[in-house]
């Protein structure tokens, strides 16, 4: 038996080596990404064509005679004065201060793709009315708010105003470009030259051109319009060039954010003269930092901020997209009738944003704020809010590629107990499956998965197993056979099943754009279909960009065919969302709709927040990768994806102990907290480090678990209101210009400010404490600091600089146990940090931690705590909720308080009772011991 096992082990190692060699050939493995494997704008024919068009007068003219105003929208035809092709513009005023703009061909040869399943519902209409008109413009008034839209006919332009203040302009730079569908030109030949060959672009209006001067110029087809080649991959384009582009001008705006995912600073940079930001979901091996290259996910939402206003642009398009950003100075006056609406004179800074997508229609939502909280709610009303996760998923996750077998998993589980370290979840990567056949278990290494799961369940722990969306092509493998027989794979352009190369070798790719496919996939997670699964097994969807090792840019051919006859180029960026959606639906359905799912996915799109968590992908054990996780997760939170984290310790390479310690300290204060590592790295169980490092990691884990009631409440607030959990400082302090570019520290909710230590050998950090007239308390020493100021804070290896804002109340669990489920009924301690005015407030959300009963049966508690006038009051913040719980208030810690003569507790129906207390005059901390009141009850505590 030993010899058989040894042979099997050698075969597994040989296969792993073969895959790595293959990856080295396909991906050009080096110490960093091989950029030549991924397109630049110059190598993307549609981006090159779009970008070749320079600002000037637009060739499009709105035909005002065609204008029709209905109860839901206004439509008007746009005429290209060179090609004479007609487009149709549809304008909608929406409730909650939003506007929608859609542009499509009036008579397309073939319908263009309109992105489904991202919007949670048709947004309610705020009717438009015509309030003014002349020969070249129409003034529209929105039914809600002081908003007007000026539609200028020639050249076509839209200006959106609030009263007399210009908020933004559409096509002010004349960069609207809509490549209409056409028949192939016979003279062109069967193939176009490869992209990037230096051919001249078609003639379009340039600076100073008049639209009529371009009339009569022949319309040409660019190289790459009908077929293009990248490296060895040929992309047929049977429908020809279909790209769309449009510009937006934002006067008064110098700071813009969003459009993740990029490994870059929080504030977006000017791209003119360089590469635009690219949105195209890709498996990028060992990605570089501080550049606009595409990564695993795409959310086409851009936010603009200044001290007085916030705006958002949501570009609803699932095709490959590039975004150019430029900084200009714009006059406050405009031609024609616009002068009547504007105030002042002179110049103002302006940011111009240009969107360019390969296919689809132009479908854009303008989110008009006026505050950033309003913008968050507006976007959430369109695409939904962050799913409320099960409580366990907010604990610590231990993962690597791969734990060898059942004994290894249970040994890791035992390691946490033996070393008094909390942990909620252990993860299994691709090696757990039988030959990487997902929904199976390797019979030699995981022969009794259900027994293993039961052992973990007895410790109140969970297991996450990877289920990737590529299926091994293997006759006799039930998953493959059913998908092939049902015709549910993505097809090639000739109608056969598309096959690519991934972890199992030759693999088919399920067509998740097909609702039938998604239903089939969801059903696979039933306990009957997923043999060996149990209620404490959850799922990880990796590689869902989709990743195709031998495909162009490590992804699928763009001319692959999907449900409904759409090409992959139309749907690429939404594919990962559909995988995430179907998996989350499956976990929900397996419990009869009772249990909340937990699914981690790598690729994402607008709306992915409804289905679970994401992470920043395959990072590296380097200090700069530790740093970059902050702006990466901040950017994701700004566009709705709050459940974000980075692989603690770095996926590639072996971290030095100091780096690993600092990463645990940071991870403890990020929404998703998972350690993960590559197959070739050393084991990283915290107990394997020297004791001095292990002790510090234990403390970081303890801080995470102590704050779980606070984290859970933040997630409920994000779920309810759409506000991010991990926030840039400017979100809370919108008028403080100093905060606008800070991305090495952040807020959790409005209560905690975190400045991780992210430099090797650091002896101190510079912390900016914002807020005029506010105070901040170090959560360890309780030392008080006044804002605004930049504070030099000395640090040791055990330091995690965290401050609680005066005026907030943070709930904690003070008994750290082996998992969150072991703590869920523990008593609560309230940390009350007083403002200079002697006030504070906070919330606490509680439910059963795992079902949808909070939603379907209103079984929850939302308590509001308010301290004012030396009295702390607990009341219900949502009377519709009801939930019986044994949790009680164990202590109240009041920071910044004087010593009272007495402390009195009042509860309804009971006489007053005195509480024991202890006051520390050096720290001004007052501790009230054992009020002993149920957290669900109304009560007040008076300091006398």
Curated annotation (Swiss-Prot):
PTM: Contains sialylated polysaccharide chains.
GO biological process, one term: N-glycan processing
Catalytic activities: N(4)-(alpha-D-Glc-(1->3)-alpha-D-Man-(1->2)-alpha-D-Man-(1->2)-alpha-D-Man-(1->3)-[alpha-D-Man-(1->2)-alpha-D-Man-(1->3)-[alpha-D-Man-(1->2)-alpha-D-Man-(1->6)]-alpha-D-Man-(1->6)]-beta-D-Man-(1->4)-beta-D-GlcNAc-(1->4)-beta-D-GlcNAc)-L-asparaginyl-[protein] + H2O = N(4)-(alpha-D-Man-(1->2)-alpha-D-Man-(1->2)-alpha-D-Man-(1->3)-[alpha-D-Man-(1->2)-alpha-D-Man-(1->3)-[alpha-D-Man-(1->2)-alpha-D-Man-(1->6)]-alpha-D-Man-(1->6)]-beta-D-Man-(1->4)-beta-D-GlcNAc-(1->4)-beta-D-GlcNAc)-L-asparaginyl-[protein] (N-glucan mannose isomer 9A1,2,3B1,2,3) + beta-D-glucose; N(4)-(alpha-D-Glc-(1->3)-alpha-D-Glc-(1->3)-alpha-D-Man-(1->2)-alpha-D-Man-(1->2)-alpha-D-Man-(1->3)-[alpha-D-Man-(1->2)-alpha-D-Man-(1->3)-[alpha-D-Man-(1->2)-alpha-D-Man-(1->6)]-alpha-D-Man-(1->6)]-beta-D-Man-(1->4)-beta-D-GlcNAc-(1->4)-beta-D-GlcNAc)-L-asparaginyl-[protein] + H2O = N(4)-(alpha-D-Glc-(1->3)-alpha-D-Man-(1->2)-alpha-D-Man-(1->2)-alpha-D-Man-(1->3)-[alpha-D-Man-(1->2)-alpha-D-Man-(1->3)-[alpha-D-Man-(1->2)-alpha-D-Man-(1->6)]-alpha-D-Man-(1->6)]-beta-D-Man-(1->4)-beta-D-GlcNAc-(1->4)-beta-D-GlcNAc)-L-asparaginyl-[protein] + beta-D-glucose
Top-level taxonomy: Eukaryota, Metazoa, Chordata, Craniata, Vertebrata
Pfam families: Gal_mutarotas_2, Glyco_hydro_31_2nd, Glyco_hydro_31_3rd
EC number: 3.2.1.207
Function, in words: Catalytic subunit of glucosidase II that cleaves sequentially the 2 innermost alpha-1,3-linked glucose residues from the Glc(2)Man(9)GlcNAc(2) oligosaccharide precursor of immature glycoproteins. Required for PKD1/Polycystin-1 and PKD2/Polycystin-2 maturation and localization to the cell surface and cilia.
Binding-site list for substrate: 283, 429, 602, 676
Keywords: Disulfide bond, Endoplasmic reticulum, Glycoprotein, Glycosidase, Golgi apparatus, Hydrolase, Phosphoprotein, Signal
GO cellular component term, pick one: glucosidase II complex
Organism: Macaca fascicularis (Crab-eating macaque)
Main localization category: endoplasmic reticulum
Keyword ATP-binding found: no
Signal peptide: 1-28
Subcellular location: Endoplasmic reticulum; Golgi apparatus; Melanosome
Database matches in PANTHER family: ALPHA-GLUCOSIDASE, NEUTRAL ALPHA-GLUCOSIDASE AB
Ranges where the record places region Disordered: 181-238
Record bears the keyword Disulfide bond: yes
Glycosylated residues in this chain: 97
Name of protein: Neutral alpha-glucosidase AB
PROSITE patterns according to UniProt: GLYCOSYL_HYDROL_F31_1 (PS00129), GLYCOSYL_HYDROL_F31_2 (PS00707)
Subunit structure: Heterodimer of a catalytic alpha subunit (GANAB) and a beta subunit (PRKCSH). Binds glycosylated PTPRC.
Composition-biased stretches (Basic and acidic residues): 203-236
Family classification: Belongs to the glycosyl hydrolase 31 family.
Coiled coil: none
Active site: 542 (nucleophile), 618 (proton donor)
